[in-house]
UniProtKB/Swiss-Prot annotation:
Its main location: cytoplasm. One of its GO terms (molecular function) is acyl carrier activity. Pathway: Lipid metabolism; fatty acid biosynthesis. InterPro entries: ACP, ACP-like_sf, PKS_PP-bd, PP-bd_ACP, Ppantetheine_attach_site. It comes from Blochmanniella floridana. Residues 2-77 form the Carrier domain. This is Acyl carrier protein.
Length: 78
């Protein structure tokens, strides 16, 4: 597991109040991890802060799974 992947999973677990082992790559924030729309906004903000990136709204809407978040950060990290 890469450092980025590990950090992303830790942030998701903390933001959504789920156990780390529930945060698997294919998990959907809403369907599998019980996030609502406010949770997903807060999650995006936490990822932006941790990785010092900006996630535009149109991109944030596409980030619906753990893997999508990891992929976005790998692609856009400075």
């Amino acid at each position: 597991m890469s450092i980025v992947e590990e950090k992303v999973k830790t942030i998701i677990a903390e933001q959504l109040g789920v156990k780390q082992e529930e945060v698997v790559n294919h998990a959907s924030f809403v369907d599998d991890l019980g996030a609502d729309s406010l949770d997903t906004v807060e999650l995006v903000m936490a990822l932006e802060e941790e990785f010092d990136i900006e996630i535009p709204d149109e991109e944030a809407e596409k980030i619906t799974t753990v893997q999508a978040a990891i992929d976005f950060i790998h692609t856009n990290q400075k």
